[in-house]
Design a protein with these regions (language model features):
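Long, compositionally biased low-complexity repeat segments characteristic
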Residues: 186-204
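Internal, active-site/partner-interface "lid" segment
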Residues: 142-162
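Short, structured loop/turn "capping" segments at alpha-beta junctions
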Residues: 125-130, 137-146, 179-181
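Short edge beta-strands and adjacent turn/loop segments
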Residues: 179-191, 224-231
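Short amphipathic alpha-helix segments
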Residues: 160-183
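ATP-dependent adenylation/nucleotidyltransferase module used to activate substrates
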Residues: 1-134, 192-196, 215-223, 230, ...
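A short interface-forming secondary-structure element
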Residues: 227-244
Length: 271
């Protein structure tokens, strides 16, 4: 909603403007499709910039300030592309309802001198929805959406596999009529990790693990045989829908997650 209205306003004012969409594994397909649809409806030029965000250790290792490194990498790509295209100002969709404190993502925007006109003009999320509806933008009532990486707890290694599982699970729930919800993922212990095995005394004595593989001393990257639990966060008004489809949801999600549960601290509506 935020960036959509900012693009609309720039076009309405006759500005020479170009939209940039940085395509990473953190964005689901519907976000990409919405961006393309918006640009087409507004007659705006949009350039897609592919970025392998998980190539960055500071992102895939998922520290508490992951958002800083991610936002920094994304806007570095945008700033470079914008400069190459002859643009001198880069704007984002941060609004006055967003916390301007020392959040990691906000810190990256400040350091890179990215301009946030909606926030500087005091335009709130509520006002943006009203303005967007009056402008006829399809995004006016779109629920707030955070990237897929936010579904994984800080400190848990992020890989393509879990992002794909989360996107798939949220897509299944959306197909059942859910909106404004999250599927949170938590890694479970490997059920085979404690399996009994007979150690090889000779192998142990030689410094080779009983598995027969040499010990590289490198920590496990977290990319093989990972075991996950899914925790659903929905709004109170969607509880009847959940009960209606409980068996179907379990059957679907248990194909990708070992455990499926409901967060009883229900999600506050993001509208």
């Amino acid at each position: 909603t935020d960036s959509a209205y900012r693009l609309y306003a720039a076009k309405a004012c006759g500005c020479d403007v170009r939209a940039y969409y940085v395509e990473t594994s953190f964005q689901p397909e519907f976000e990409r499709e919405d961006a393309r649809r918006l640009a087409k409806e507004l007659g705006a030029d949009m350039k897609t910039l592919p970025l392998n965000i998980l190539a960055l250790d500071s992102v895939r290792n998922n520290p508490k300030d992951r958002c800083y490194y991610c936002k920094n990498a994304i806007f570095h790509e945008i700033l470079k592309a914008a400069a190459d295209d002859g643009f001198s100002c880069v704007m984002d969709g941060t609004n006055a309802s967003d916390d301007a404190g020392d959040r990691p993502g906000m810190r990256a925007l400040r350091e890179l001198k990215v301009f946030s006109p909606l926030r500087l003009c005091g335009i709130t999320k509520k006002a943006l929805r009203e303005y967007s509806r009056n402008a006829g933008l399809f995004t006016w009532d779109k629920p707030a959406y955070a990237c897929l990486a936010t579904r994984v707890p800080s400190g848990t290694f992020i890989d393509e596999e879990i992002l794909a599982r989360i996107e798939w699970a949220e897509g299944q729930l959306a197909n059942l009529g859910f909106s404004d919800f999250r599927v949170r993922a938590a890694e479970l212990p490997d059920p085979d990790a404690n399996a009994s095995r007979t150690p090889d005394p000779d192998a142990s004595a030689s410094g080779i693990p009983a598995s027969g593989a040499p010990d590289s001393g490198v920590p496990h990257s977290g990319t093989s045989k990972r075991n996950w639990a899914a925790r659903l966060q929905i709004t109170k008004d969607q509880l009847p829908l959940l009960l209606e489809h409980q068996s179907q949801i379990l059957e679907l999600l248990k194909t990708r997650f070992s455990q499926v549960s409901l967060d009883l601290e229900l999600r506050a509506p993001s509208r």
